[in-house]
Amino acid sequence: MKVLVLGGGVIGVTSAYYLARAGAEVTVLDRQDAPASETSFANAGQVSPGYSTPWAAPGIPLKALKWMLQEHAPLAVRLDGSLFQLRWMAQMLRNCSAQRYAVNKERMMRVAEYSRSCLQQLRADTGIAYEQRTGGTLQLFRTQAQLDAVERDVAVLRECAVPFELLDRDQLAQVEPALAQARDRLTGGLRLPKDETGDCHRFTNELARIATGLGVELRFNQNVDGLVVEGGRIAGVRVNGELLTADRYVMAFGSYSRQALEPLGLDLPVYPVKGYSLTVPLGNPALAPQSTVLDETYKIAVTRFDDRIRVGGMAELGGFDLRLDPRRRATLELVVNDLFPGGDVARASFWTGLRPMTPDGTPIIGATRYANLFLNTGHGTLGWTMACGSGRLIADLITGRSPEISTDGLALDRYTHRPARHLGGSSTPVSA
């Protein structure tokens, strides 16, 4: 079976790896000159299933209004002139009820927890190295109100049997010693000891190398001009004036998936949400984090790699604008200097990327109404967290294996209310 995977980020490469492991003949196409050159290039570095939480949550609409008035707000909305942006935001607002939040969080955690186990198995199978750490993640609260509000998430963690620890301000430094200098500015924290961290860019490049050893062909500098449809199937992909054909196709273009599939009449509710990061050379290890720390006030993650600190976060809804905003750099510098002043911020590299976000936070994984076209996109801020599980799921669906977890509520038909065409069996639409 020949499979074309469109996209060479962490989602596309993990899909290719698992497909090759299942016996498929796989080719990966990407417009860049190397794997993980866009959204997977410099993300926050956390693999955090326990924090797989929908942005669409009770209270978020009011918080969003308040954030718009703040200098260092975690969210910014700039109208891009498209009807799709307005429709996407309306869909997100409809998912802000307690009922929808619970449904969406369960779906996200299902994929994320499975993905962690897949990553651990992949690591055991391949010995892959990507500056990984298994020290858990720590969410920091600066106010009592934030600490009180975490009860909603704690209830879900209990329900899903996810280990956690609630810490007071004196216990924070026992987990992250460098926080001792910030003790008086903090109230407490929520620690998930099973979470991990690692360099997504390095992981993707290493896995791409491993995948080539399994026969995967990686083709870069490939500009996809469009997909060709014949008789309810994809007949090929036009790339640099050439028609490439396969038996199955996987769309893993991230934020650009919608544009690629719109001519086919597929309406993907995937919007580009812009995020930023700083990669800071490590100066004083005693004033650096041991793993990942999440600042609840600014919605920013600070992650330790071997000799670097990665500071990432924020969300801008403004289309496909990739300009670097110096105000966002100032916010990232503010947080890392306040919590972990052990890096050389003056020599930090500043980066931005577009996360492919769905209104309900859940990725879109599965079949479409075109019998040989599959989707693996819409992972938002959790592409690294969900990559291995998503890649394994899509490989199982394509090769006819029974997935190890339920795929309920993951396919595109939760938005279209129209069943996808499976190569074998049927699908029941799930409302979103």
UniProtKB/Swiss-Prot annotation:
It is an enzyme of class 1 (oxidoreductase). GO terms for cellular component: cytoplasm; plasma membrane. Its cofactor is FAD. One of its GO terms (biological process) is D-alanine catabolic process. It catalyses: a D-alpha-amino acid + A + H2O = a 2-oxocarboxylate + AH2 + NH4(+). One of its GO terms (molecular function) is D-amino-acid dehydrogenase activity. The keyword Cell wall biogenesis/degradation does not apply. Coiled coil: none annotated. Its EC number is 1.4.99.-. Pfam families: DAO. FAD binds at residues 3-17. It comes from the Bacteria. Pathway: Amino-acid degradation; D-alanine degradation; NH(3) and pyruvate from D-alanine: step 1/1. Keywords: FAD, Flavoprotein, Oxidoreductase. HAMAP family: DadA. Belongs to the DadA oxidoreductase family. This is D-amino acid dehydrogenase. It comes from Delftia acidovorans (strain DSM 14801 / SPH-1). The lineage of its organism: Bacteria, Pseudomonadati, Pseudomonadota, Betaproteobacteria, Burkholderiales. The gene is dadA.
